[in-house]
């Protein structure tokens, strides 16, 4: 029964999204509370820029949840990329003490995503090298570039991404979203990752603001959704990229 093929994953998706929607509602008050730190919504400050980006991200996540319930796999992929880029832009604004990119952003310029990847790479490796056990540079830039390119396939309608929109049952484009529901369920981790990245940026902001109370509160929210990854799994993932650099 073709209806069962579509309805079964749809039910699973709706049930699984309940946790994500609950987490979203826990994050939102923290985002809204940042407004107290802003005198004017047109001020050219880091906190105002980050507040605007967080606001957009929270609304984008709401749309992602709606699209996921409808089996809109392609559109979810495009919007997850948007959340990822906004997260990295927030990191760039926090890490770049000179406000160079912040001022360009307020002037209406588009900040290249590579600039954010470079800043995050340098920061994380600076922390990593403080560990006396660490001997190699972490391939942060390479990993983030790989992820960026994967999601770019959805944005730019690459053939590889559009193959996910082929309905193998009807041998047609996936107008009835049989494939869409299947790929939403299979790729559910990308929605989780978008929420995790949002929480990590909020934690980074609280650290920059020396707001320990809110840092601890958001860290507890993060623990509810953060996937468990073993040290060995992380090592195997990083090894793929360190080998490419050699």
Segments (PLM) and residue ranges:
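A cross-kingdom marker of C-terminal helix-rich interaction/assembly modules
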Residues: 1-80, 90, 99-246
